[in-house]
Amino acid sequence: MQSARNEQRGTGPESPHAASPTEGFEVLLITGMSGAGRSHAAHSIEDMGWYVVDNMPPKLLEPMVDMMTASKSGFHKLAAVIDVRSRDYFMDLSSVLSHLDDLGLKTRILFLDADDNVLVKRFESVRRPHPLQQGNRLIDGIHEERRLLENLEERADIVINTSKLSIHQLSTKLYEALTGNGPTTVSVHIFSFGFKYGIPIDADFVADVRFLPNPYWVPQLRELNGHDAPVSEYVLSNDKATQFLDAYEKAIEIAIQGYAQEDKHYVTIAIGCTGGQHRSVAMSEALASRLRSHGLSVSVSARELDRKTQ
């Protein structure tokens, strides 16, 4: 990381204040007791947009950061999982993390723990030996691992005891700890479509608004679409459209609250009419506006607008 260090220290003669390529890059070390949920944590953290590497020796952290910043991969968060099978590398950890801190990297340690009796039950349920058991009792392996990791737990930035947590609850705690945003937020994507071109297979909800009067049969509206004010006004002025939006808004709001509790980060809503040009487009935009009023992040697209109106 010589070039990164030079830029950060301002040794470049032409741009003494040039930003380091590692500026804003984050490193998270995932460690803790075997059976405490490291694998589940890694999957959840990957879903949050981190690049996750399993069983990485600490000495490879710096070259990995170099490679990711040089390749402009789009990832600016690296999470590395380290367990007791790489315990020979722990002696390198302190110096490596100190060096990364000197480079201006935001580096944190996540330590996952669980009570001994819970760990015993988890290992027995999967009928696997503890990695440090070595022919001894299961509890002996757990005690040895706890001894090895004692100092690492003390210097951890985030410690989570998973004894009483479900997988979803662990994911929620990780999201809160790593983002500082409180409970899981759910992003909503709404898209309009035409039933004549097929029902989408990737939607969580599919709504049929073909019960509304069709602007296609109004000559002055036929060549327009649901983004145009005359069409939107025609569709939304119908009492049934308002009743539908009132009911659907409430249903979606309840579902999103449940999705957040289950750690689902996004929901896709498809709204269809015959050709996907008029009613579904106008209703998608109207629903999006309502959901945004609740503070939700909502995006909208129209699947069929590139098709010629028929």
UniProtKB/Swiss-Prot annotation:
Stretches for region Disordered: 1-21
Keywords noted in UniProt: ATP-binding, GTP-binding, Nucleotide-binding
Designated name of the protein: Nucleotide-binding protein BLA_1368
Pfam families: PapZ_C, RapZ-like_N
Keyword NAD part of the UniProt annotation: no
KW Nucleotide-binding (keyword) present: yes
Family: Belongs to the RapZ-like family.
Organism: Bifidobacterium animalis subsp. lactis (strain AD011)
